[in-house]
Amino acid sequence: MTELETHLLNALEQLQQDYMQRLSEWESAFVELQKMFSLTQRDNAMLNERVMQLSQQVQHLSEQTERLSQLYSENWR
């Protein structure tokens, strides 16, 4: 094997090692992103449920306020 072939082989092996390292890093990052997505999805579902509950409370309070306003108006005629 010539010196040039040896250098090329070493360079190719180094490229392969670098590629495998980067691939491993990307795979790890992808797994972490999947976990983050799952947690965010769960949190969003919980927040959505809470928003719906609060919206119902606001609607209920609005209805109560309207009834009280009507009673007040009727009593002060």
From Swiss-Prot:
Q: Which InterPro entries match?
A: MbeD_MobD
| One Pfam match | MbeD_MobD
> Superkingdom of this entry's organism?
Bacteria
Per UniProt, which keywords does this protein have? Conjugation, Mobility protein, Plasmid
> Belongs to which family?
To E.coli MbaD and MbkD.
What function is annotated for this protein?
This protein is essential to promote the specific transfer of the plasmid in the presence of conjugative plasmids.
Which protein is depicted?
Mobilization protein MbeD
Q: Report which gene this protein is encoded by.
A: mbeD
